[in-house]
Amino acid sequence: MKKMIFAGCLMAGASVFAQAGETDSLKVVNLQEVQIVSTRATSKTPVAFTNVSKEELKKQNFGQDIPFLLSMTPSALTTSDAGAGIGYTTLRVRGTDGTRINITANGIPMNDAESHTLFWVNMPDFASSVKDIQVQRGAGTSTNGAGAFGASVNMQTEGISMQPYAEINASYGSFNAHKETVKFGT
């Protein structure tokens, strides 16, 4: 019995040393960024559209939801339950309600599968991560089904930064509305 215990201890000890001697043979390969982009309108596309850049969004982004940031685009109408543009907001384009507006982020549909609308209250301060937005009025170039005959809103988020960065923003407004944003990356 003692010989079996001794043999077991000897084998366990030998396996520990065998694992310690192995070297890592994995290579690290940095790949280029892959960006998923949905169909966007260009000057050659027969679609009425408006591009909103990051700079334009920054000028207006005080914590309100994206529909209020798009309120200055042609044919857009926004409403808010509380009146401040935060929380339950809606977007209408050319009179069409949110159930007929296709909204995508990096080409991925954001609309609810059942009601076909987007609940902006579930996306607080998403505008701080957006690179640009294209609003297409009318049927547009969307390939995401019947929900797009009113309009299409295509949001592209910021790409991967190869340089370390840090950013802190704070805003305060009426009705005790406030927004704090912290962004960093390595």
Question: What does each model-identified segment do?
Answer:
Residues 18-20:
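Boundary at the C-terminal end of the N-terminal hydrophobic targeting segment
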Residues 83-85, 145, 173-176:
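Short sequence motifs at beta-strands and strand-loop junctions characteristic
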Residues 109-137:
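Short acidic/polar hinge/loop motifs at secondary-structure boundaries
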Residues 24-25:
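Coil residues (strongly favoring Ser/Thr
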Residues 67, 71-109, 131:
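Extracytoplasmic beta-strand/coil segments of soluble accessory domains associated
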Residues 13-15:
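N-terminal signal peptide c-region/cleavage motif recognized by signal peptidases
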Residues 66-69, 89-92, 104, 120-125, ...:
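N-terminal periplasmic accessory domains that precede
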Residues 31-61, 90, 133:
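N-terminal periplasmic "start-of-domain" segments of outer-membrane beta-barrel proteins
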